[in-house]
Curated annotation (Swiss-Prot):
Subunit and interaction comment: Component of nuclear RNase P and RNase MRP ribonucleoproteins. RNase P consists of a catalytic RNA moiety and different protein chains. Several subunits of RNase P are also part of the RNase MRP complex. RNase MRP consists of a catalytic RNA moiety and several protein subunits.
Protein name, entry field: Ribonucleases P/MRP protein subunit POP1
Functional summary from the UniProt entry: Component of ribonuclease P, a ribonucleoprotein complex that generates mature tRNA molecules by cleaving their 5'-ends. Also a component of the MRP ribonuclease complex, which cleaves pre-rRNA sequences. Required for rRNA maturation, including 5.8S rRNA processing.
Organism: Arabidopsis thaliana (Mouse-ear cress)
Disordered: annotated segments: 1-24, 49-91
Length: 826
């Protein structure tokens, strides 16, 4: 080896070094090959006759060399950047355009709060992504994605994705309310407002909810009269906490299900509770929670804090057959290591660790309704190799020292509050993610180092004046309850500033984004209710349907009168069911001369629906007991009874239900049913469900009946006059007076709230029917029939409001098929 003046050693034989050159001099590289380039240029010039212009017959975009739109965009971009720099760096006030302001707002990622438009409507953090691909609409104070562009089709592809892929939905319009106070006071408030109440569950389920191991769904009601005016379906969850006096001291216990009953008040500790409410009913629900807290303080003298977490937490919903697989690819737990924060490093997880993370999200290892708590790495730093599944490459700079994976059912109470202070403590600052330009600069430096190249122009990018940022995110994973044919689903609760990071990661890994319309399709296909469309007893339903009716009326007025469709009632006239019930109670029912029933129908405040909806087996059973004169054959499903220690609380719930039922003898009690067409027919939203006669059933069941003789119809003139609009704007049932119309008239017992979905393998519509009338129909259809030939479904007639034909359908009462309650909203 010989040593040069610079001290570098080289090989004597003059061979090439195994190391790549530190720098490549492009000028010397081109000078060494100048003769080759000149000869190539001469050959090309001879072939083109020294005319290097493109031939006119070969030109396509003749002005492509002079790209004026691109130049204009570049000039505007430079002006915007200069204005943004002047605003951020200058001391004097600079007047900037609205476009620059809006771009700054939409590109920004503040720690808390939503961006708002000029009229105060809030935008989701994924607003820009959705606005480029979806039809946006203003709903409940938010700009929300309604659905893909077009006429509202595409349900087949969405249902296929739910069965074979994975869907993702930004549910940040759900807002959490946090309650803080003694455990006994919080339980009293929940028992006062929720149905089913926490204490009405079995001891095992109740202990799991109270310890924070699982969440629960319930209906939120008013605390003041009217006693049982429904507000909205909610999801509530407790902050996990270890209670020493309630723990079983045996060493072999797992700590779950060993709490003492609620009546044991030897130890009352300070607990925290989240109640998630839909945006359409948030103001009403938040107000009633504060009223309940004030009432609890007036009665007991114990203070309970209630405040909103709007703009702090976000929720993402993922469902589909491959939802667990998507979580395995995206969520990787942060390791408890500390490295130099200025150096980008690569770390790998062992095969066993990767297997443990992958098994965490499998359906067999996580129970339905469970809560998983994790600190995960920023998904932008995760690089997975598609060819090697033995290791997972992770690029990260610095991660907070946390446990790798934590499950609330196995979490020690001493570590869990410390890990998730940022989520559960409202006063704590939520750390936003690292900015995108910083991560891109670090990745660029990493690539340059791997190629052994120096970047002389490399400078640290400019970042916003944030005090701190993080590369790991705390989140809660909620496993959806398995109900019917619903696909596997998860809900992610995470800081609002992290929503765009995980949204882009899920979409880039194959998730199919959906809006409000697509989510309703999937909900109906799975047989689950969708809020607020399938909750007619809530004020949110009335306001939503009235706004839809106004939009449809505006579209109809744009059409010429000759082709303008006749008006139909939106929302459905639920009070018309009173007439059918009164007809069944006595054959001597008289009607006034103007066709209106003498049955008095009372108004119910601002709500268009006057009645109740039985959503639990207990409430339906209590309602059936008030009608002792009728032999109503309804069988609500009820699996487990609570322990005797909880009977006092159940008696309070029973009083609440009875007070609601006896408040007015004319109140309706509706139950949710699923309608399947017996032979043919497609049921639309708003279709009327009618009571058939035995002759109708035998006629429509006959396979040899064809033509008009084999159909049950009403006269074409009665289609538009079946419901009549009153001068005050309400709709009432038009009772027929002549004999011919009376023979074809069928009395309504309910209405369809969600129609058939195209592309469903087993189409079903969701409707609400009166429980009393369903019981009478079943009694009539089971009479004089052998027990083995009795169907559990009930035959009904369904007619779309613009059609004259009745279709035979089978109605399945959900409370007879589903365990315990019907409050699980999709």
């Amino acid at each position: 080896m010989a040593t040069t003046a610079n001290g570098n050693s080289k090989k004597r034989d003059g061979g090439l070094s195994s190391l790549a050159p530190r720098k490549i001099n492009v000028q010397k590289f081109s000078e060494a090959r100048a003769p080759e380039l000149e000869s190539l240029h001469s050959i090309v010039s001879e072939r083109l006759n020294k005319d290097f212009r493109s031939k006119r017959n070969k030109r396509r975009r003749t002005n492509s060399y002079n790209n004026q739109p691109a130049k204009k965009r570049n000039i505007k971009r430079q002006k915007s950047q200069s204005l943004i720099g002047q605003v951020s760096g200058g001391d004097h006030e600079v007047k900037i355009t609205r476009r620059v302001k809006r771009r700054m707002e939409l590109k920004g990622n503040p720690e808390t709060g939503f961006c708002t438009s000029g009229d105060g409507t809030k935008r989701l953090r994924t607003h820009v992504w959705h606005a480029k691909r979806f039809t946006m609409t203003k709903l409940w104070g938010f700009h929300l994605p309604l659905g893909l562009h077009g006429r509202g089709r595409g349900s087949r592809d969405v249902l296929k994705q739910s069965r074979q892929g994975v869907l993702v939905h930004d549910a940040s319009y759900h807002i959490a309310v946090q309650l803080e106070g003694p455990e006994g006071s919080l339980l009293s408030i929940l028992n006062m407002l929720l149905e089913p109440s926490p204490s009405s569950h079995s001891k095992e389920v109740f202990d799991s909810i109270l310890t924070g191991g699982s969440y629960e769904n319930a209906m939120l009601y008013h605390v003041e009269p009217p006693v049982s005016q429904a507000i909205a379906p909610v999801t509530y969850m407790w902050r996990p906490s270890k209670i020493p006096k309630r723990r079983n001291e045996e060493k072999g216990g797992d700590g779950i299900g060993t709490d003492l009953p609620v009546s044991d008040k030897d130890h009352e500790d300070f607990r925290k509770l989240w109640v998630w409410i839909h945006a359409s009913s948030f103001s009403e629900g938040y107000a009633i929670l504060k009223v309940a807290c004030q009432k609890q303080m007036n009665e007991t003298g114990v203070s309970v804090d209630c405040f909103s977490l709007e703009g702090q937490l976000a929720k993402l919903e993922i469902f589909g057959s491959k939802a667990s697989h998507l979580l395995q690819k995206t969520l990787h737990p942060a390791t408890s290591t500390s490295e130099n924060p200025s150096i980008l490093r690569k770390c790998s997880m062992e095969k066993a660790e990767v297997k443990n993370v992958a098994d965490l999200y499998t359906e067999e290892n996580v129970s339905s309704g469970a809560i998983l708590a994790q600190f995960v790495i920023d998904p932008r730093l995760i690089l997975t190799s598609p060819h090697d599944d033995r290791t997972v490459s992770v690029e990260t700079i610095k991660t907070e020292p946390t446990e790798s994976v934590e499950t609330t059912t196995n979490t020690e109470a001493e570590t869990f509050p410390e890990v998730f202070n940022c989520l559960w403590d409202a006063n704590s600052e939520l750390t936003p993610p690292e900015e995108e330009n910083m991560l891109c600069w670090e990745k660029h430096q990493s690539r340059m180092d791997s190629l052994c190249l120096d970047d002389p122009a490399a400078e640290v990018p400019k970042v916003s004046s944030r005090p701190r940022s993080s590369r790991s995110c705390p989140l809660l994973l909620l496993k959806h309850k398995k109900l019917g044919n619903a696909p596997t689903g998860w809900s992610l609760i995470l800081p609002l500033s992290w929503i765009k990071v995980f949204w882009n990661a899920f979409v880039s890994k194959g998730a199919h984004a959906i809006g409000q319309r697509e989510k309703r399709w999937v909900s109906c296909d799975d047989g689950l209710p969708f809020f607020p469309s399938d909750f007619p007893d809530c004020k949110a339903y009335s306001s939503f349907t009235l706004s839809e009716a106004a939009d449809l009326e505006e579209k109809a007025q744009r059409r010429p009168p000759a082709i303008r469709p006749f008006r139909i009632p939106i929302p459905p006239p639920w009070n018309s069911i009173h007439v059918t019930r009164s007809i069944g109670e006595g054959s001597n029912q008289k009607f006034s001369s103007n066709g209106r029933s003498v049955v008095e129908i009372s108004s119910y405040g601002g709500n268009l629906f006057d009645g109740i909806v039985a959503r639990t087996s207990d409430s339906l059973t209590t309602f059936l007991q008030t009608f002792t004169s009728d032999n109503m054959l309804l069988f609500p499903h009820n699996t487990s009874k609570p322990s005797t220690d909880l009977m006092m609380t159940l008696q309070e719930d029973d009083k609440k239900v009875r007070a609601q039922i006896h408040q007015s003898s004319n109140k309706l009690c509706l139950v949710r049913v699923l309608l399947h067409a017996f032979k043919e027919g497609s049921f639309e939203e708003g279709a009327v469900v009618c009571a058939p006669t035995l002759a109708d059933i035998s006629l429509l069941k006959s396979s040899c009946s064809e033509g008009e003789d084999g159909r049950v119809t009403i006269p074409q003139s009665s289609v538009s006059s079946y419901f009549q609009e009153q001068p005050c704007g309400t709709w009432e049932l038009n009772v027929p007076e002549d004999t011919l119309t009376e023979q074809s008239h069928r009395w309504p017992i309910g209405f369809v709230t969600t129609g058939f979905v195209r592309g469903s393998k087993k189409p079903a519509a969701e409707a609400f029917c009166d429980a009393v009338l369903l019981g009478r129909l079943r009694d009539e259809q089971w009479r004089d029939k052998d027990v083995r030939r009795r169907k559990k479904q009930i035959y009904v007639l369904v007619r779309n409001l613009r059609s004259s034909a009745f279709r035979l359908a089978l109605a399945t009462i959900v409370l007879e098929q589903q365990d315990y309650c019907d409050v699980h909203c999709f």
